[in-house]
Regions:
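Histidine-rich, glycine-flanked metal-binding segment
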Residues: 1-25
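Divalent metal-dependent hydrolysis catalytic cores, especially in the metallo-beta-lactamase
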Residues: 49-69, 85-95, 120-132, 151, ...
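Active-site-adjacent beta->alpha loops and helix N-cap segments on the catalytic face
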Residues: 68-74, 131-146, 182-193
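Alpha-helix-loop-beta-strand connector modules within alpha/beta enzyme cores
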Residues: 76-94, 138-157, 195-200
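Active-site neighborhoods of metal-dependent hydrolases
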Residues: 115-133, 179-293, 298
Length: 315
C-alpha cells in the first residue's frame, strides 16, 4: 500500500527511512557499461567496479564488449547471490569484423547464425556487431538475431554513412555518438520511423573533447567521498587532480547532447551509457551531459531508467 503518513498500515518490524526532501527513483540502467569482471580467469568476491556502480545507484548494466568467460560467470554468480553486483548483462566478446585473433568471419547467413548461436548458448541475449565492413555482413547478423530473438547493438564506428544504414537495416540501436555536429529533419524522421535506439556515450563523444574531460575539468572529483570510497586511488587521482582544462566551447559532447534532445522530442529512444570511464559516477556524468544538451532533469532520468529498460527488452 501507499499513501500519506498516518493513513497507511506499517508492520511493526518494518524499517522506516526518513526521506523528507529526498527523491525516490528506480535504480539507474547503464546500457553501455564496460568494466573488468575477472583477472587471469579469477572472479573476485568483491569487485570494486560493481561496488562503485551500486554506490551510485546503478542497479542494472549491459556491457557491449567484455570477455565472454568472465562476464557471464560473474552474471550467474550475481543471480545466485554469491557476489554483490548490479544485474549484469552483456554481449560477451564482440563480433569483430577486422583482422585479429578474435575476428568473427561472416560471409553468409549460416556464418552469422553460427556466431549468434554460440553467444546465446553462453548467456547472451545481445551481440555487438563491431566494424563488420560490408553492409550485407551486418544484415546477415540482424536476420540471424531476429530468428533467435536477440538484440544487435553495433559499434557506431564514427562513420556517418554506416550509421544511417544501421538505422535503415533495423539494428536495436546505435552505440556511440554519430560523428556529426548536427542532424536535421530528414535524419530525425528516418531515425524515429525506424524505432532504433541511441546510446551516445557522451563521456567519450566522437569529434572533440568528451563529457568525461569536462566533468574532471569543472569538478574536484577526488574530493567526492563516495567516488574515493569505491574507486581505487590510482583510477581517480591522475585524471582528477592533474586534469586538463579547456574553454566551454571546445567541449564537443554538449553539441552531441543537443542531438539526443532532438531525438527524444521526436519520440525517439535515448539511453544512458557511461562507458565505464569512472564506474558509478560516469553514469551520472552522462545524465548531466544530457541536461547540458537541453534535456530536462526528468527527461535525463527517464533516459537513465525507463528508456534503458525498453532498449534491453525488459519493459
Amino acid at each position: 500500500d501507499s499513501g500519506p503518513d498516518g493513513k497507511v498500515s506499517i508492520p511493526e518490524n518494518a524499517h522506516v527511512l526518513p526521506l523528507e526532501g529526498r527523491l525516490v527513483m528506480p535504480g539507474l540502467i547503464d546500457t553501455h557499461a564496460h568494466g573488468q569482471q575477472a583477472a587471469s580467469g579469477f572472479i573476485p568476491q568483491q569487485n570494486w567496479v560493481d561496488y562503485a556502480r551500486l554506490g551510485f545507484g546503478v542497479t542494472t548494466v549491459h556491457d557491449p564488449s567484455n570477455d565472454t568467460q568472465s562476464i557471464f560467470a560473474a552474471s550467474e554468480m550475481t543471480k545466485a547471490g554469491l557476489i554483490t553486483a548490479p544485474r549484469t548483462f552483456s554481449t560477451g566478446r564482440i563480433l569483430y569484423g577486422a583482422a585479429g585473433s578474435y575476428k568473427a568471419e561472416i560471409d553468409s547467413l549460416d556464418d552469422a547464425e553460427f556466431h549468434l548461436e554460440r553467444m546465446k548458448a553462453v548467456g547472451a541475449f545481445s551481440v555487438k556487431s563491431y566494424n563488420q565492413p560490408r553492409r550485407d555482413q551486418r544484415q546477415q547478423i540482424i536476420k540471424a538475431a531476429r530468428e533467435m530473438g536477440m538484440l544487435v547493438v553495433p559499434e557506431g564506428g564514427a562513420t556517418f554513412m554506416h550509421n544511417l544504414t544501421m538505422i535503415v537495416d533495423g539494428h536495436t540501436g546505435i552505440e556511440h555518438t554519430v560523428p556529426v555536429e548536427m542532424i536535421y529533419g530528414d535524419v530525425l524522421d528516418l531515425w524515429r520511423g525506424a524505432a532504433v535506439g541511441y546510446t551516445p556515450t557522451l563521456n567519450v563523444a566522437y569529434g572533440g573533447l568528451g563529457g568525461e574531460n569536462y566533468w574532471y575539468d569543472v569538478d574536484e572529483v577526488w574530493r567526492n567521498d563516495r567516488v574515493m570510497a569505491f574507486n581505487p586511488p590510482h583510477k581517480v587521482i591522475p585524471r582528477a587532480r592533474r586534469r586538463t582544462t579547456a574553454p566551454i566551447e571546445d567541449y564537443n559532447h554538449i553539441r552531441q547532447a543537443r542531438i539526443t534532445k532532438k531525438l527524444i522530442d521526436q519520440g525517439g529512444l535515448v539511453q544512458a551509457g557511461g562507458h565505464g570511464q569512472l564506474n558509478g559516477i560516469c553514469t551520472h556524468w552522462e545524465l548531466w551531459s544530457f541536461v547540458q544538451g537541453g534535456m530536462t532533469p526528468f527527461e535525463a532520468l527517464r533516459s537513465g531508467t525507463l528508456h534503458g529498460a525498453k532498449y534491453l527488452g525488459m519493459y
